[in-house]
Regions:
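Conserved N-terminal beta1-alpha1 strand-loop-helix module at the mouth
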Residues: 1-56, 62-70, 200
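Catalytic beta/alpha-barrel core
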Residues: 4-6, 34, 58-65, 82-91, ...
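Catalytic cores of alpha/beta
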Residues: 11-19, 68-72, 96, 114-124, ...
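Glycine-enriched alpha-helix->loop->beta-strand junction motifs that scaffold or abut catalytic
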Residues: 20-24, 79-82, 96-108, 123-130, ...
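Glycine-rich phosphate-binding active-site loops on the catalytic face of alpha/beta enzymes
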Residues: 24, 29-34, 111, 127-138, ...
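Conserved, mostly hydrophobic/aromatic
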Residues: 28, 85, 121, 175, ...
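Alpha-helix-loop-beta-strand connector modules within alpha/beta enzyme cores
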Residues: 43-57, 78-80, 94-106, 142-161, ...
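C-terminal alpha-helical cap/extension of soluble enzyme domains
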Residues: 154-214
Length: 214
């Protein structure tokens, strides 16, 4: 499973990218807003993410019509070949996604909640589809099952699931075990990968033994 960082907060993102565990960052207008930014800051986020080692930077287009979404998507894609343009799974967004995909722009259909959305994403040529795991169902196990069904619906085709809005590392592990190829983690969840209590206890034991060596 490829892991991404669901943040536009520069400091934590760069620190986590430096671990080598994450392929890039995913953003949307809300994530930008939470970092004190706006959609106008997307190019700057792209620049520092790429400088920090991101192989892919997911930037979201927006608009009330397919023309608006597609045109803004083209501008985002022009930043570099590492950009993946995100669009929502609305009529306008899906239409724009199909246009961008036909032009060779890597795309992700976001705001997905059902296996039918996975079918839609493949139909419009999206490279990825992003289900919001925590919003699919109150029960995490049920939500994971739905995302696995989305993954299976796509089969071996060119569209892949990138699971988003995850609340636990258990869900990440379950999705990875089922073959889901990618997930994006918020900063607290990403940091939790490195702070399991048993891992920290083992590390402390190793450090004590090393310090006791003559």
């Amino acid at each position: 499973m490829d892991l991404y960082l669901d943040t536009a907060d520069r400091g934590p993102a760069l620190a986590l990218l430096a671990t080598g565990a994450f392929r890039g960052v995913t953003t949307n207008p809300v994530i930008l807003q939470r970092a004190g930014l706006t959609v106008a800051d997307a190019p700057a986020v792209h620049d520092w993410a790429v400088e920090g080692g991101a192989e892919r930077v997911f930037l979201q287009s927006w608009g009330s019509t397919a023309d608006e979404v597609a045109e803004r998507g083209r501008r985002l894609a022009a930043l570099s070949d590492r950009v993946v343009v995100k669009v929502t799974a609305t009529l306008a967004g899906s239409t724009a996604c199909a246009r961008l995909a036909s032009e060779g722009v890597p795309t992700l259909l976001t705001g997905a909640f059902t296996p039918a959305h996975a079918v839609l994403s493949a139909g419009v040529g999206a490279s990825w589809v992003a289900p919001y795991v925590s919003r699919i169902a109150p029960d995490e196990a049920t939500a994971v099952d739905v995302v696995v069904a989305m993954h299976r619906a796509l089969g071996a085709g060119p569209t892949a699931v990138l699971a988003a809005s995850l609340r636990s590392l258990d869900a990440v592990g379950a999705l990875a075990a089922a073959g889901v190829p990618a997930a994006t983690l918020g900063v607290p969840l990403a940091e939790a990968l490195f702070t399991h209590e048993l891992t920290l206890a083992a590390d402390g034991t190793f450090e004590e033994a090393a310090a006791a060596a003559p």
